[in-house]
A protein has these predicted regions:
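Conserved NAD+-utilizing ADP-ribose enzyme module
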Residues: 1-70, 76-145
Length: 145
C-alpha cells in the first residue's frame, strides 16, 4: 500500500508523546489483529520493528510517496444515519476515516483497531488524515465495524 502527499505539505514529524491512531483490520482479538493488506499480524503490546520511511518523488510530480511504513488514520467517525441500500444489493454505511469517507457493507467482517505511535517515532500525515509511521503498537482494543 502506498501513502501519498502533496509535496508542498510534506513534513516529517517526531511524536512528542504517544499518539492514538486507528486501523481497519480483518480480524481482531485482545492478543492480536490482522491487516487486510499483506495479512500482517500485529501482536498486542509489541512495538513493531522500526521501518525506514523512504520518500520518493517522481520527476514532474506534485506528489511524494512512501511505500513502506505502518499506515493508520488520525481519527475515525461514524456518520449518523448513513446506512443506505447499496448499488449491488445489501446495505452500506459510511465511516469517515481521517478526512475521507469510506463506504463499508453493513454485513462486513472488519474491525476498527486502536494503535499507538510511540513517543519519539517518525511519522507523516497527509491531507486525507492518513498517517504513515516508522513504528506502531497495537493496544488490544477494537470494535466490530
Amino acid at each position: 500500500m502506498c501513502w501519498t502527499c502533496n509535496i508542498n505539505k510534506l513534513k516529517a514529524q517526531i511524536a512528542k508523546e504517544d499518539i492514538n491512531v486507528y486501523k481497519i483490520v480483518k480480524k481482531a482479538t485482545k492478543e492480536y489483529c490482522i491487516s487486510p493488506f499483506m495479512d500482517y499480524t500485529y501482536y498486542s503490546k509489541d512495538i513493531q520493528p522500526s521501518l525506514t520511511l523512504g520518500v520518493t518523488i517522481e520527476p514532474r510530480s506534485i506528489f511524494a510517496k512512501i511505500t513502506e511504513g505502518y499506515h493508520s488514520y488520525s481519527s475515525v467517525n461514524f456518520v449518523f444515519d448513513s446506512v443506505v441500500e447499496g448499488i449491488f444489493g445489501g446495505y452500506v454505511k459510511t465511516i469517515q476515516c481521517g478526512n475521507r469517507k469510506e463506504i463499508f457493507r453493513v454485513d462486513n467482517s472488519l474491525y476498527l483497531a486502536i494503535f499507538i505511535i510511540p513517543s519519539g517515532c517518525v511519522y507523516f500525515t497527509n491531507e486525507e488524515g492518513e498517517i504513515v509511521s516508522n513504528k506502531i503498537r497495537y493496544t488490544g482494543k477494537y470494535i466490530k465495524l
